[in-house]
Amino acid sequence: VSGRIELKTREQMRVMARAGVIVERALAAARAACVPGARTADVDAAAAAVIAEAGATSNFLGYHGFPATTCVSVNEEVVHGIPGDRVLAAGDLVSVDCGAVVEGWHGDSAITVIVGGDASRQDRALVAATDRALWAGIAALATADRISDVSAAIEEVADEARLHPIDGYVGHGIGTQMHQAPDVPNYRTRGRSPRVRPGMCLALEPMLVIGTDESAILNDEWTVVSVDGSRAAHWEHSVAVHEDGIWVLTAADGGASRLAEHGVVPVAP
């Protein structure tokens, strides 16, 4: 995403945090709906009900014509899966990406769920390492000089786990739009990246695969799949940077429970 980086006031960040906790609740409902025999449309409906009940709106529905409230991507589907009649089975990996808007301010977050709670050791390791990569990136943001410091932290975890970030798919700025400058790659890039500064709100979202980093888009013009059919995991949080620290906008505790192991204490905006 190119363009000017939108810097937020702390008051605006607080509205984004309201959107963020609605997204967190919607994803909790989606997680509970990821059971064997459920359709991906059922997962979407569970999240949509929470957003509607909270009086927020979906930022995915109608986005460039996207037909649902969430992206539900199963196994070899990396991101942007369209919810429908696909039936979930035990051992499936399901990533659910969801967003909400409150007073014009956006939240965006994603989780990966193992249907039925158990999967192969390789799949469990994939899901856990992708989650770890996200939190390593968030922790790095607390002290980062440039966006590239965040990218390096994410890629380091991926490398350790022998996983590959999907080429060309990156995190992004978020605020009055769901996708804004700057890009937040999940891998090191050449050249100088933007400097991290107070007022930035960023959606970090590692998308890691076991096999090749190459992807393709299906005929529905949305669903991104790994070219070799290997499974993928995807985790995402929206994070605010202000003068006194960082705050995970899509976690009710600001990310405190997960940042503790990194020695980072989030500070509310």
Language-model-detected regions and their locations in the chain:
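Active-site neighborhoods and metal-handling regions in enzymes and metal-associated proteins
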Residues: 1-269
